[in-house]
């Protein structure tokens, strides 16, 4: 069976090309275009050429006078030409920004400016090959379906042929769009054209739809703002009644523009109260203040000074400052005065914005603050002062505890303890006591022993130990000590017996500590020595008698007038010093007796330094 295709009437019909161009333009602009194309694609030229396609009949399923159904193999290599015009974006940065969300873009200024260039594209040398299913009916028109991708190749000529990468890019993009056109859009275009030709009902229906879709723009326009909303409110959020709306409309139509819908006003208030995010209905976070809100704009409640009663600008409803009607107490007045005098916090209207969250919920009536007691140990010039002071307020008890003690000299008298100002300020933390940098560091027991050894070796007299560390102490008392209760308390226990061959020193009472003046080593003095101390006295070089019957009061007597802390520290130091002296005496006597020679002095022999005493 043979068919003759009359291709010349299609080329001679001018109306056919016009309708085909309109349908192709609509089809090309219907699908999503790449971001580089910034204008509509317009088909300016369409020519099917003089060479018709070749059809090979593979199957005929239905054949009648008014219908036909068959499967063909189509091949086309004609001289058809298609010309398109559009505008492209030559700035790649602008193309990138168009494909990204504006919230995440860096918002450049000059670099984001678009550069639009007109583009003309001509498609020629189109080669098609594929299997086509053709269905014809006078009632339903012509339906053409491609079972495979028919496009084999085509030639794309554009304005940017001199730029290789632009030419290749356009070639690839246009081929992709044409494949979509042949598979999806071309069957629909052919079907609509056939309905216009053979179906009068479809043509009338299409004309009616075009009139409804594109109404005529003739006639005066209508202002939608002149019609009030269903639930109008004024600029202050007050709902307007029908009579008020009528009175407003009688005066002039200008005031109608200031009416707001109540729903829109609530949405704007919710947007103002939101966390400045993209979502309009972000759930609120309780007891959270955003530091970006606490700016100078809140002093005037917005740049325009307008205050909305529904939601104040840049503020939260649960963070408003509530002013109590009750008068301030004396403690509140003092705390307010101290907070006003403190430099560092601005005294503006929004300075307490972030600190007053939940002020209405956590009132002062049911709060229980802990007591803050600061004991002042500083010496005062007045005979009697209040050493203990209580700072801070207590809502549970109104009692004030004041402890009056006597001023006592202590080793901590040189340090300065500043007054604490506890104003319950949540912003400014309490200042730690500042220590005076010129205060002399207190010497430990090891420091005093090392100083004494150095002075003994170099025969240099050391300065006396300060009075707060105790009095000078002798190696061996030359006079009987007065027996009193303090001396009996500080008497050290007898040292433990070490070995049977070591010398056992006699029991020695600890005298008030005195400074040991060093003297040059010399021959033993001819002063009478008691028999009980003859063995121990031979191990030491004689000292000049610097002791008298009248001893100064010991440090224990001074400690009796001090505080309990000072007495305990003095007792501990006295017992430790007495123990160390007894250990030194016993070790020195044992080493001297074991050597069996008295030619060398005490410091000529090897001396192991005592271990460090940590207190």
UniProtKB/Swiss-Prot annotation:
Any one GO CC term of the record: ERMES complex
Residues of the SMP-LTD domain: 1-195
InterPro entries recorded: Mdm34, SMP_LBD
Keywords of this entry: Lipid transport, Lipid-binding, Membrane, Mitochondrion, Mitochondrion outer membrane, Transmembrane, Transmembrane beta strand, Transport
Keyword Transmembrane appears in the UniProt entry: yes
Compositional bias annotation for Polar residues: 325-342
Membrane-protein topology: Multi-pass membrane protein
Gene Ontology MF terms: lipid binding
Compositionally skewed regions (Basic and acidic residues) per UniProt: 444-459
Domain notes: Lacks alpha-helical transmembrane segments, suggesting that it resides in the membrane via beta-sheet conformations similar to those predicted for other outer membrane proteins and porin.
Assembly: Component of the ER-mitochondria encounter structure (ERMES) or MDM complex, composed of MMM1, MDM10, MDM12 and MDM34.
Protein name as catalogued: Mitochondrial distribution and morphology protein 34
Source organism: Paracoccidioides brasiliensis (strain Pb03)
């Amino acid at each position: 069976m043979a068919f003759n295709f009359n291709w010349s009437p299609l080329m001679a019909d001018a109306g056919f090309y016009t309708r085909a161009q309109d349908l192709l333009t609509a089809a090309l602009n219907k699908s999503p275009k790449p971001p580089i194309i910034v204008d509509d694609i317009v088909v300016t030229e369409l020519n099917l050429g003089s060479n018709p396609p070749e059809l090979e009949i593979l199957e005929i399923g239905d054949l009648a006078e008014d219908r036909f159904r068959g499967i063909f193999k189509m091949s086309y290599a004609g001289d058809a030409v298609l010309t398109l015009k559009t505008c492209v974006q030559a700035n790649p940065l602008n193309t990138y920004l168009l494909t990204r969300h504006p919230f995440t873009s860096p918002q450049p200024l000059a670099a984001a400016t678009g550069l639009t260039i007109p583009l003309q594209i001509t498609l020629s040398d189109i080669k098609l090959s594929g299997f086509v299913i053709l269905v014809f009916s006078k009632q339903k028109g012509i339906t053409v379906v491609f079972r495979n991708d028919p496009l084999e190749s085509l030639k794309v000529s554009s304005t940017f042929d001199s730029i290789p990468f632009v030419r290749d890019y356009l070639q690839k993009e246009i081929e992709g769009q044409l494949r979509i056109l042949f598979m999806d859009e071309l069957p629909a275009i052919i079907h609509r054209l056939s309905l216009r030709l053979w179906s009068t009902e479809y043509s009338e229906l299409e004309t009616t739809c075009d009139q409804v879709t594109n109404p005529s723009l003739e006639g005066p326009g209508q202002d939608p703002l002149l019609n009030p909303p269903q639930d109008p409110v004024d600029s202050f959020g007050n709902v307007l009644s029908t009579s008020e709306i009528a009175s407003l409309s009688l005066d002039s139509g200008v005031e109608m523009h200031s009416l707001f819908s109540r729903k829109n006003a609530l949405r704007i208030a919710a947007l103002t109260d939101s966390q400045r995010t993209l979502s309009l209905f972000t759930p609120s976070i309780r007891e959270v203040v955003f530091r970006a809100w606490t700016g100078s704009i809140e002093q005037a409640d917005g740049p325009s000074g307008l205050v909305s009663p529904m939601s104040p600008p840049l503020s939260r409803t649960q963070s408003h400052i509530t002013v109590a009607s009750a008068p301030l107490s004396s403690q509140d007045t003092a705390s307010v005065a101290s907070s006003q005098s403190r430099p560092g916090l601005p005294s503006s209207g929004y300075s307490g914005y972030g600190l007053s969250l939940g002020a209405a919920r956590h009132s002062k009536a049911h709060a229980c603050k802990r007591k803050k007691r600061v004991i002042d140990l500083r010496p005062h010039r007045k005979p009697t002062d209040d050493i203990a002071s209580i700072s801070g307020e207590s809502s549970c008890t109104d009692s004030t505890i004041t402890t009056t003690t006597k001023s006592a000299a202590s080793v901590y008298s040189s340090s300065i303890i500043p007054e604490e100002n506890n104003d319950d300020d949540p912003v400014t933390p309490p200042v730690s006591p500042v220590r005076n940098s010129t205060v002399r560091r207190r010497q430990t027991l090891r420091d005093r022993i090392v100083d004494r050894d150095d002075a003994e070796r170099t025969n240099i007299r050391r300065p006396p130990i300060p009075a707060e560390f105790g009095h000078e102490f002798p190696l061996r008392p030359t006079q009987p000590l007065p027996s009193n209760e303090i001396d009996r308390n500080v008497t050290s226990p007898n040292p433990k017996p070490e070995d049977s061959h070591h010398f056992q020193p006699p029991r020695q009472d600890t005298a008030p500590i005195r400074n040991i003046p060093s003297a040059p080593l010399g021959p033993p003095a001819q002063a009478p020595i008691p028999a009980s101390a003859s063995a121990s006295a031979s191990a030491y070089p004689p000292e000049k008698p610097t002791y008298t019957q009248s001893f100064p009061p010991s440090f224990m007597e001074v400690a009796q007038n001090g505080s309990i802390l000072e007495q305990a520290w003095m007792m501990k130091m006295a017992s430790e010093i007495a123990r160390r002296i007894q250990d030194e005496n016993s070790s020195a006597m044992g080493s001297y007796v074991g050597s069996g020679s008295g030619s060398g002095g005490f410091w000529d022999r090897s001396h192991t330094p005592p271990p460090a005493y940590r207190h």
